[in-house]
Regions:
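A well-structured
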Residues: 1-150
Length: 150
């Protein structure tokens, strides 16, 4: 028979947050919510009319919001994966998941509007050298367009 090794390695997530009670988590979530709210107010309903510079500002802001949110999400899911029976960790993971869902729900307009931008406009955005790195993302998004809900 194979012997089970219960001394498995443990992730060191202190580079992200010290623990699930780290006050920086709440601070970061507030910053992300504030950034998301500003993003929605500034860009919702306007994506198809952006010039190439505004497109670049918009998509880079969206990227930063997503990166920051995924940092918290990664922390909570990895801690939860290592100890699913701990009630406090479970509550933390559930709370982060709820925040994650709320924020991304407010941002869904971005990918929906972006997927409907016509080819001429996208090409004008891509003519800006700094925007061309987004072409693969836009291509994938546009291929999914028929399957997206309004």
């Amino acid at each position: 028979m194979t012997e089970i090794n219960y001394n498995l390695p443990v992730w060191d997530l202190t580079e992200i947050y010290t623990d699930i009670k780290d006050p920086k988590i709440k601070t970061d979530l507030k910053k992300i919510k504030d950034s998301s709210n500003k993003f929605v107010k500034k860009w919702k309903g306007k994506i198809k009319d952006l010039n190439s510079l505004d497109f670049l500002k918009c998509i880079e802001t969206y990227q930063k919001i997503c990166e920051n949110l995924h940092k918290i999400g990664t922390h909570s899911s990895l801690i939860f994966a290592t100890n699913m029976e701990d009630a406090e960790i479970s509550r933390y993971n559930s709370s982060v998941s709820d925040e994650f869902t709320e924020i991304f729900s407010s941002l869904i307009f971005f990918t929906l509007e972006l997927s409907k931008v016509d080819d001429v406009k996208i090409q004008s955005w891509m003519n800006n050298n700094n925007s061309s790195k987004w072409k693969p993302y836009l291509n994938v998004l546009r291929k999914r367009n028929p399957y997206l809900l309004d």
